[in-house]
Regions:
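Conserved beta-strand scaffold positions in the cores of enzyme catalytic domains, especially
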Residues: 87-91, 108
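Active-site donor-binding loop signature of nucleotide-sugar glycosyltransferases
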Residues: 90, 94, 113
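C-terminal boundary of histidine-terminating zinc-finger modules
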Residues: 101-123
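C-terminal alpha-helix
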Residues: 123-135
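Short, glycine-rich, amphipathic interfacial segments at transmembrane boundaries or analogous
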Residues: 94-102
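Long, low-complexity intrinsically disordered regions
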Residues: 138-157
Length: 157
């Protein structure tokens, strides 16, 4: 599944928990991205890493963020698919509302629009949009589109 997705993609953003084992998983995923870019999808690039479940008060979170930043700075000027990548400025803070929302079949923007989690994802959307469209500014409020629980086709089945 991962390889098929990477073969179809042009750009990848990776969510990363700031933990040691997640860094190991990132290493394995970078190997897979390198393999796909070298064999079947030369257009594939890693645009950034988003730190999730981030707790700024922990030393580990800061160390992982520095390690990721250092890794990407060392890759500048290489031919790696992540040579222009970055650790995104927006960090998705640990927030119970993010964990609760899916159990209600809703996005965090629907379930808890005033929560830290919703705020963080709005900021992330603005940051990613600014990377692709530096001359455009998104409105401060991102509209919430309600999740559709089913379609006429699925109801008829």
């Amino acid at each position: 599944m991962v390889v098929a997705g990477l073969e179809a993609a042009e750009e990848v953003f990776i969510p990363l928990q700031p933990h040691f084992l997640a860094l190991h998983g990132l290493s394995k995923l970078l190997d897979t991205i390198q393999w796909v870019a070298g064999r079947t999808n030369p257009a594939l690039k890693l645009s950034g890493v988003v730190l999730c479940m981030y707790e700024a008060s922990t030393r580990l979170a800061g160390e992982v963020a520095r390690d990721v930043d250092e890794f990407f700075s060392l890759a500048r000027g290489t031919n790696a698919p992540w040579s222009e990548s970055r650790s995104l400025t927006t960090k998705i803070r640990r927030n119970i509302r993010l964990a609760e929302a899916p159990s209600f079949g809703q996005s965090v923007l629907e379930y808890a629009p005033d929560s830290n989690g919703a705020d963080d994802y709005r900021l992330l959307a603005r940051e990613i949009h600014a990377l692709a469209h530096p001359d455009e500014v998104l409105p401060l409020e991102v509209p919430v589109v309600p999740h559709r629980r089913g379609t006429a086709a699925s109801a008829a089945a």
